[in-house]
Swiss-Prot record:
Keywords: Cytoplasm, GTP-binding, Hydrolase, Metal-binding, Nucleotide-binding, Ribosome biogenesis, RNA-binding, rRNA-binding, Zinc. Zn(2+) binds at residues 289, 294, 296, 302. Transmembrane segments: none annotated. Coiled coil: none annotated. This is Small ribosomal subunit biogenesis GTPase RsgA. NCBIfam families: ribosome small subunit-dependent GTPase A. It comes from Streptomyces coelicolor (strain ATCC BAA-471 / A3(2) / M145). The lineage of its organism: Bacteria, Bacillati, Actinomycetota, Actinomycetes, Kitasatosporales. PROSITE patterns: ENGC_GTPASE (PS50936), G_CP (PS51721). GTP binds at residues 154-157, 208-216. Its EC number is 3.6.1.-.
Length: 366
């Protein structure tokens, strides 16, 4: 690829996050005549890729491994064939970050939701009672991904009393230490300028339950009706999720937004570091425990239990921490067991091939 075309790629793709480091990583594929692009949508073995020539439809048959964490996903930077019908994605560049969840708390398979994300925006609706444990779960996955989390309290116009709103923000802040908490009303435009400033210049993934107001929030940030939004039920102010695929869109003020479907299940997947980050105050207290392997159950000299007794640490936080750690440990154990089973299966397959070859060889010597 010539320096002129390389400069053209940089200019055309910069609004989607392309930079010099991505260009350096892509250099070997540019030498092969492949085009750089970013995946904006994945659908049934194909994907839409934005390139310097516009959005192209490409087949992912060459990058569809058995490992679900290595499939092409929204946010990936890929190398695409310059022509062909169909044209193919040949590879994707190593990911800087990846947002991964477990497909089920009872299974060990992971599902990658978005790649190369800088900000993980967790949308939480104020139209319903706050579920702090679920917020902590989302934040654990966000921290584990490598992205910077942000909690956005949507539909803030439904809480007109500023004192009540301040208490709700404070409640969420206790479940999200070190994470900005921003009340927003897309209907009234409140808080949108602050949110737009936070996510500008990077890639943000928008996460949350069905009806959390993600599509309305995405439309407000985009300044257009890019997402299909269903009517909200007047009886309770709840919405119904409308985004059915993960879409990547350039924001008018800079930055890129990945909108995701409403997530009913948010299972952890090897997110131990993320859990520790969410409950950082428990980790700090644990350093003061008398025993280094203190389980914070009934041990003497436990600083965590002492903090609960004094009211410095809500008991709910410790219970939530224990629950998430137990779940994560189960998933890790199952993942390790599945990996060992796959290795044994491969050994048996190779052994069968070797046995067949030996029998064929012996038969030829008779």
């Amino acid at each position: 690829m010539t320096s002129t075309s390389s400069h053209s790629n940089h200019s055309a793709l910069s609004s989607y996050g392309w930079d010099d480091s991505w260009a350096d990583a892509f250099a070997p594929y540019a030498a092969e005549g492949l085009l750089p692009g970013r995946v904006v949508r994945v659908d049934r073995g194909q994907c839409d890729v934005v390139t310097a020539d516009g959005v192209l439809r490409a087949d992912t048959a060459f990058v569809t491994p058995h490992d679900p964490l290595r499939v092409v996903c929204t946010g990936d930077w890929v190398a695409v064939e310059p022509g062909g019908n169909p044209r193919y994605v040949r590879t994707y560049l190593p990911r800087r970050t990846a947002f991964v969840r477990s497909t089920s708390s009872k299974r060990s398979e992971g599902q990658i939701l978005a790649a190369n994300v800088d900000h993980a925006v967790v949308a939480v609706s104020l139209a319903v009672e706050l579920d702090l444990a679920r917020i902590e779960r989302f934040l654990a996955l966000a921290w584990e991904s490598g992205a910077q989390p942000l909690v956005v309290l949507t539909k803030a116009d439904l809480v007109p009393d500023p004192v009540t709103l301040a208490y709700l923000v404070q409640d969420v802040e206790t479940a999200a230490p070190g994470v900005p908490v921003l009340p927003v009303s897309a209907e009234q435009g409140e808080g949108l300028d602050v949110l737009a400033a936070v996510v500008s210049g990077g890639t943000a993934v928008l996460l949350g339950q069905s009806g959390a107001g993600k599509s309305t929030l995405a439309n407000a940030l985009l300044g257009e009706a890019a997402m299909d939004v269903q009517a909200i039920r007047d009886v309770d102010g709840k919405g119904r999720h409308t985004t059915t695929t993960r879409n990547l869109l350039a924001l008018p003020g800079g930055g890129v937004l990945i909108d995701t479907p409403g997530l009913r299940g948010v299972g952890l997947f090897d997110a131990g570091n993320g859990v520790d980050q969410v409950f950082a105050e428990i980790a700090e207290l644990a350093e003061e425990c008398r025993f280094h392997d203190c389980a914070h159950e009934s041990e003497p000299g436990c600083a965590v239990l002492a903090a609960i007794d004094s009211g410095a640490l809500p008991e709910r936080r410790l219970e939530s921490y224990r629950k998430l750690m137990r779940e994560n440990q189960r998933i890790v154990a199952k993942t390790d067991a599945r990996a060992r089973a796959e290795i044994r299966k491969e050994y048996k397959r190779r052994g069968a091939i070797g046995k067949a070859a030996m029998e064929a060889k012996r038969g030829g010597l008779r």
